[in-house]
Amino acid sequence: MFVWGLFCILRIALKPDRKYAVRLISKTAISSSGRADDNQDCCMVRGSRPRWRSNFSKLF
């Protein structure tokens, strides 16, 4: 499971011209800029577990 997640992340990072990669990069830029009012934009909500599975299902 960990290897599959690492593979997916590397595949997205190495091909930034794809539509879902641009969407993922823009979401991380928005969430890291300090705007944490939208819980859907970031994969980590304060006090909870990471929501990798739901975010990855939106990509495909």
From Swiss-Prot:
Q: Does the keyword Transcription regulation apply?
A: yes
What this protein is called in its record is: Putative transcriptional regulator XtpA
Q: Which organism is it from?
A: Escherichia coli (strain K12)
Q: Does the keyword Transcription regulation apply?
A: yes
Disrupted gene: phenotype observed? Increased susceptibility to sub-lethal concentrations of aminoglycoside antibiotics neomycin, kanamycin, streptomycin, spectinomycin and kasugamycin, but not non-aminoglycosides tetracycline, chloramphenicol or erythromycin. 10-fold increased transcription of gvcB.
Which keywords annotate this record?
Antibiotic resistance, Transcription, Transcription regulation
Miscellaneous comment as given in the Swiss-Prot or TrEMBL entry: This is a leaderless mRNA.
BP-aspect Gene Ontology terms: response to antibiotic
Specify the superkingdom: Bacteria
Its biological purpose: Controls the expression of small non-coding RNA GcvB, which represses the expression of many amino acid transporter proteins and uptake of aminoglycoside antibiotics in cells. Might be a transcriptional activator. An RNA (xtr) with a tRNA-like fold possibly derived from tRNA-Arg(UCG) is encoded entirely within the protein; xtr does not have the sequence corresponding to tRNA anticodon or variable arms. 10 synonymous codon changes in the xtr region of xtpA have the same phenotype as a deletion mutation, suggesting the mRNA secondary structure is important for function.
